[in-house]
């Protein structure tokens, strides 16, 4: 083999190894990505039990039930559909009925969302952008849910431009 052929063989081999490594990394990341879904999206997508995802919406008023050993159940609604949620752990201090929530976990075989992480709104105007957008899209947005997503950002841009 000439020098040029050896160099091309080495470059080709390196590219193949790099391609395989990239494919493995992308495959691993694809499996660990958690998507955000509203209860309506969950019912439309027919998400399989055990598949991890994030569930966002409002905690339905009157649905919070506290059990033994930090077990809690409640329903998450997006105005069109509701989904029962079961969680075992300490809820955030700002967790309330009628407030925005994002829970991470998976559906069990009975259709109950088994959450292992629950996030609640952190001040009087916060709502996850995805939840607010979903509520607006479905026509269920109410102005008393808090500041519209991006409102603080828009007002700061106005102050800068003046």
UniProtKB/Swiss-Prot annotation:
Main localization category: membrane
Bilayer disposition of the protein: Single-pass type II membrane protein
Region (Disordered): 140-162
Keywords for the protein's UniProt record, in alphabetical order: Cell inner membrane, Cell membrane, Cytochrome c-type biogenesis, Heme, Iron, Membrane, Metal-binding, Signal-anchor, Transmembrane, Transmembrane helix
UniProt xrefs under InterPro entries: CcmE (IPR004329), CcmE-like_sf (IPR036127), NA-bd_OB-fold (IPR012340)
Its job: Heme chaperone required for the biogenesis of c-type cytochromes. Transiently binds heme delivered by CcmC and transfers the heme to apo-cytochromes in a process facilitated by CcmF and CcmH.
Record localization: Cell inner membrane
Domain of life of the native organism: Bacteria
One example of a Gene Ontology biological process annotation: cytochrome complex assembly
Residue intervals on the Periplasmic side: 29-162
Binding annotation for heme: 122, 126
Keyword Nucleotide-binding attributed: no
Record topological domains on the Cytoplasmic side: 1-7
GO cellular component: plasma membrane
PANTHER family attached to this UniProt entry: CYTOCHROME C-TYPE BIOGENESIS PROTEIN CCME HOMOLOG, MITOCHONDRIAL (PTHR34128:SF2)
Protein name stated in the entry: Cytochrome c-type biogenesis protein CcmE
Transmembrane segments: 8-28
HAMAP family assigned: CcmE
Any one Gene Ontology molecular-function term assigned to this protein's record: heme binding
Presence of the UniProt keyword Heme in the record: yes
Entry's family note: Belongs to the CcmE/CycJ family.
